[in-house]
Curated annotation (Swiss-Prot):
It comes from Mus musculus (Mouse). It comes from the Eukaryota. Belongs to the OB-RGRP/VPS55 family. One of its GO terms (biological process) is negative regulation of protein localization to cell surface. Keywords: Endosome, Golgi apparatus, Membrane, Transmembrane, Transmembrane helix. The keyword Membrane applies. This is Leptin receptor gene-related protein.
Amino acid sequence: MAGVKALVALSFSGAIGLTFLMLGCALEDYGVYWPLFVLIFYVISPIPYFIAKRVTYDSDATSSACRELAYFFTTGIVVSAFGLPVVLARVDVIKWGACGLVLAGNAVIFLTIQGFFLVFGRGDDFSWEQW
C-alpha cells in the first residue's frame, strides 16, 4: 500500500509542476508557448541514468566512470532546463513572470522525477517490480 501512496503523491506533484508550466504559457498576460520546450528536457533527463544502470554491472564499486558520466549528462540537462526560460526572458521572448512560473514548475517536476527514482528504483533488476 505504501507504493500506491507514493505513486499518488508523485503524480499529484507532477500535476502541480505541469500546472505551473502551463500557467507560465497560457495566462493572458504571457500567452507565448515557447517555454513548453522544457518538456523535452523532462523526457530526456532520465535517459543517461537508464543507460548507466543497464551498462554498469558492478554495483559494489564506489565509483564508476559510466555512472559519473551519466550524472554529468543529467546535470547538464537539468541546468539547461533551468537556463532556457531565463535566456528566453532575457531576450524578451517571454515575460519574467512566465519565467518564474516555468522555473517553479521545473523545480517541482525535477524533484518529482528524483522522488520517483528514490521510491521505485531500489530493486536489483530494472523491472520496477513495486508497481
